[in-house]
């Protein structure tokens, strides 16, 4: 597949010239297009689609996945709070060592736990202060409002 991200540049092989963020956005665009076709599986998995993106672009990706999630099951592994906040449900995956073997634990997070986890995602393990958790709760509330706006706009 040939690709050009910059005006006036020649097309080059996608695998050679696209950054991690560009690859993430291209994958999201392709999955978004395929989601609109009949007969497409009802589940889509995005494994760290947030690689190479942040800030506003992370919010755009989160909103697009939310829109796909209106008609498909979306499973997303993410490290960005913007994407986690837009999810309808959030699970925390932890790996730990037990008797010389790696174990994985998956926990469905309650609303309060989501706020704590998003606060940690924003500021690191030591950043679970009351103000950080309040900020995360605001992020979750704003994400909920944004999803409503997106759903209303689509249904018009």
PLM regions: where:
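Internal helix-turn-beta structural module
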Residues: 1, 17, 27-29, 115-124
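Flexible loop/turn segments at secondary-structure boundaries
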Residues: 9-10, 35, 52-53, 83-84
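Short pre-catalytic strand/loop immediately N-terminal to key active-site residues, enriched for Gly-Thr
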Residues: 11-17
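Conserved D-loop-proximal element of ABC-family nucleotide-binding domains
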Residues: 12, 38-39, 51-55, 59
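Charged, polyampholytic interaction/assembly segments that form long, compositionally biased interfaces
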Residues: 17-24, 33-35, 148-153
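C-terminal lobe/lid and adjacent interdomain/linker elements of RecA-like ASCE P-loop ATPase modules
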Residues: 56-156
């Amino acid at each position: 597949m040939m690709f050009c991200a910059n005006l006036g540049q020649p097309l080059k092989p996608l695998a050679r010239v696209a950054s991690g963020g560009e690859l993430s956005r291209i994958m999201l665009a392709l999955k978004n297009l395929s989601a609109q076709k009949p007969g497409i599986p009802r589940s889509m998995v995005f494994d760290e689609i947030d690689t190479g993106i942040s800030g506003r672009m992370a919010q755009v990706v989160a909103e697009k996945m939310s829109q796909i999630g209106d008609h498909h099951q979306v499973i997303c592994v993410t490290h960005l709070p913007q994407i986690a906040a837009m999810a309808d449900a959030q699970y925390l995956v932890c790996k730990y060592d037990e008797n010389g073997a790696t174990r994985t634990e998956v926990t469905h997070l309650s609303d309060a736990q989501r706020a704590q986890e998003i606060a940690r995602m924003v500021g690191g393990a030591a950043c679970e202060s009351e103000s950080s958790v309040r900020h995360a709760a605001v992020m979750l509330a704003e994400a909920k409002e944004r999803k409503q706006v997106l759903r209303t706009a689509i249904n018009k």
